[in-house]
């Protein structure tokens, strides 16, 4: 099977809105994935479900083929992270680990998908595809990051990283395909930086994306030792962000800055909607 063709998901989760909360209505997982309890912990967003994805192996190995699928049905709100940074170990010559992440966000849903970075060990080889399908009136923040580590301190690097991000509106052709392919990279290529990341922010058309991009740029400027750039995506569909840093902690600060801006926008929009909802509510009989 081609590396670009996803296998049957070994993690398959579906989320629905029931009353004032989001719940899981499909929970299927197999080794190495583990899913324990999920939580409603955000007092400002009581509808939002927090999920921590775990792996029994704690790492990605040379010939792993892993597919995840997350489906958010109409009105669901989900925040997803992982148990910690995931190591990607050495692959035999001619082999590479393959991972697909399929994210489907339906009308009115909200997804915050921020897994911890991958740690690429010497001679690691990873092909990953992240496919985001997002309805026009849904919101999604999706991040991806990697760093490099040689436990022997000799400066050895990974063998290959083939990463593709696909973004599409619901049921339509891709409006963004972003690919990075590094094979046997030289140390000089990274210019002293060892941690790299990207983020895609999709918002409903009611938001001023150009103004949001400027807010992000201002937030990034306040983070030391972080190289960051934010750009508008094609057709004004969203915002794309790139990060380069010397350490992972600076990447995390950048991602936190994006999430903080998104949260402020979201809570502001909800506060503005509350008076209108109250004004149009029908009186009920005592």
UniProtKB/Swiss-Prot annotation:
One GO CC term on file: cytoplasm
Superkingdom of this protein's organism: Bacteria
Localization per record: Cytoplasm
GO molecular-function terms, A-Z: nickel cation binding
Keywords of the record: Chaperone, Cytoplasm, Nickel insertion
Protein family per UniProt: Belongs to the UreD family.
Record's subunit section: UreD, UreF and UreG form a complex that acts as a GTP-hydrolysis-dependent molecular chaperone, activating the urease apoprotein by helping to assemble the nickel containing metallocenter of UreC. The UreE protein probably delivers the nickel.
Protein's job: Required for maturation of urease via the functional incorporation of the urease nickel metallocenter.
Database matches in PANTHER family: UREASE ACCESSORY PROTEIN D
The protein's name: Urease accessory protein UreD 2
Species of the source: Bradyrhizobium sp. (strain ORS 278)
